[in-house]
């Protein structure tokens, strides 16, 4: 019988394990601060727990609408209009089980083999894995504490190639906690338009 590993798809064989999965390495240290996942240290609000419990008792324990609950979709559209002053069609609101699942699906939807997506480092460890499993290439633009984690336009321009398809933005940033102000975003707009880049944002925080 051939080795078990040979049954595993090559895209997974060639993918490095994420930091959060390297339990042997983590076990060697006693003072590790886990910045890999945004798992809050407070209990979910009673109103949410009570509502979920009440809905479960009422029978809402089965598969729902595959496109997501219509009330939830309407709420997302309303929030987009309130927060960003942008109308959003319900047909453009897919709902996923988590932001990580959503980002993985976006990568699969937009990246062809060899396409590049640029991320600003440091970044959440899953971004690279998701891009590579979709057949893409993850390019990094470094940011530094000594510069207030600011995005350097020259570094960004230098990282863009003819295969660059998307720019990934995640602020407040995990793990640095950096915030991108409105004027910082505005500086990126000419570069994005010049190179016709898709912008993917992770706004979990």
Residue ranges and their predicted role:
Residues 87-93, 113-116, 163:
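Short acidic capping loops at alpha-helix termini that bridge into adjacent secondary structure
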Residues 133-139:
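A short helix-loop-beta submotif of the ANL/AMP-binding
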Residues 139, 145-205:
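Active-site phosphate-binding strand-loop segment of PLP-dependent enzymes
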Residues 27, 57, 111, 160-161, ...:
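Residue-level signal for alpha-helix termini/capping positions
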Residues 2, 7-98, 105:
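N-terminal small-domain helix-loop-helix segment of the aminotransferase-like
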């Amino acid at each position: 019988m051939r080795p078990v590993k040979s049954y595993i798809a090559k895209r997974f064989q060639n993918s490095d394990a994420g930091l959060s999965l390297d339990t042997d390495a983590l076990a060697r240290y006693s003072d590790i601060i886990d910045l890999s996942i945004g798992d809050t240290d407070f209990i979910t609000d009673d109103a949410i727990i009570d509502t979920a419990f009440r809905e479960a008792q009422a029978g809402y324990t089965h598969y729902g609408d595959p496109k997501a609950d219509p009330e939830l979709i309407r709420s997302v559209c309303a929030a987009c209009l309130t927060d960003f002053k942008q109308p959003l069609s319900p047909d453009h609101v897919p709902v996923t089980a988590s932001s990580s699942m959503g980002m993985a699906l976006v990568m699969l939807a937009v990246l062809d083999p060899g396409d590049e997506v640029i991320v600003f480092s440091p970044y959440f460890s899953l971004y690279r894995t998701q891009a590579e499993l979709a057949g893409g290439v993850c390019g990094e633009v470094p940011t530094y504490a000594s510069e207030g984690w600011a995005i350097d336009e020259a570094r960004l321009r230098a990282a863009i190639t003819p295969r660059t398809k998307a720019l990934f933005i995640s602020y407040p940033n995990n793990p640095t906690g950096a915030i991108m102000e409105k004027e910082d975003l505005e500086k990126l707009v000419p570069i994005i338009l010049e190179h016709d880049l898709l912008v993917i944002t992770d706004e979990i925080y």
